[in-house]
Amino acid sequence: MELTTFWFAVIAFLWTGYFVLEGFDFGVGMLAPVLSRNEAERKQVLGTIGPVWDGNEVWLITAVGAMFAAFPAWYAGLLSTFYLPIALVLVGLIVRGIGLEWRGKVHSSTGRARADLGILVGSFLPAFLWGAVFADLLHGSATAALAGGIFSLSLCVLHGAVFVALKTSGPVRSRARRTAMITSAVALPAAVVALSGIPGASASVSDWAAAPWLWACALTAMAALSAGIALTWRGRDGWAFAATASSIAGTGAALFGALSPAPLPGLTIAEAASGPYTLNVLTWIGLVALPFVLGYQAWSYWVFRKRLVAEVS
């Protein structure tokens, strides 16, 4: 395998991992006001992501850093083309981080309400805009961007609801399951539209038919999403979360597969890549660093694997 292909695959993996992990973070942030009825339940909901949300953002930093080093032309073109939405994503991430950190340090109801608003807005912006950016990048139309944004937003909400059901107990868990079932009414149709090709977009369904494995990824994503909804209805929270995570992973595989070999219009992977020496150095750094990052993430999720209960004040 050529190093350019290898690093494109690594970047696709990093972005997909980011969407899987931050997807439920965004969903929990948006659902916190819906799933909680009092301060104890609000802490219970936000506590599901408290130990892991900042670690999940490392995937974004790593993905963007790898793009900058391995494919500087792709990095520059993507950020310049989508400057405004990406700037709004960064604003959202900053506001969300401030809200999550600040909330535990304020004791007034007004301060907590402002922090909750920051968490909500800071979760909504990236959940919607990342889908819009990548859909526009793939299809090149405003209709595609809107559909992609709705799909990613609904999928994050569903993924977050399933995660809360997995990590909590009592009334919050029941509400999370109901919310997941309600959200599925939007997520499933949005998945069909986004994954099968949007009418009027520049990349037609026939383009996908030329690569059967892309169809396989898209169909796997839709099947996993359907399975996640069914498993949630049956109360199999762990398997439901694995299914929604697989749906996001399948979507990521289909997305980056469709972006290859031209991640930007008129720019191929080979043209966007750094020189052989840079790619060789990056490969050695990646082989040493990535196992530690993955190992630490796995360890942190294992340590905080237990369900949370609402504290009685």
Regions found by a protein language model. Give the residues of each.
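Membrane-interface helix-loop-helix junctions at boundaries between adjacent transmembrane segments
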Residues: 76-89, 95-152
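Hydrophobic alpha-helical transmembrane segments in multi-pass integral membrane proteins
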Residues: 126-139, 189-200, 250-266
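Hydrophobic alpha-helical transmembrane segments
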Residues: 147-151, 280-295
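Juxtamembrane membrane-water interface segments of multi-pass membrane proteins
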Residues: 26-52, 68-76, 101-112, 161-179, ...
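Helix-coil boundary and interhelical linker segments in multi-pass alpha-helical membrane proteins
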Residues: 1-11, 66-83, 134-145, 200-204
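N-terminal signal-anchor module of multipass membrane proteins
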Residues: 1-55, 61-64
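Membrane-water interface at loop-to-transmembrane-helix junctions
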Residues: 141-150, 171-186, 208-213
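Short, membrane-exposed interhelical loops at transmembrane-helix boundaries
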Residues: 264-282
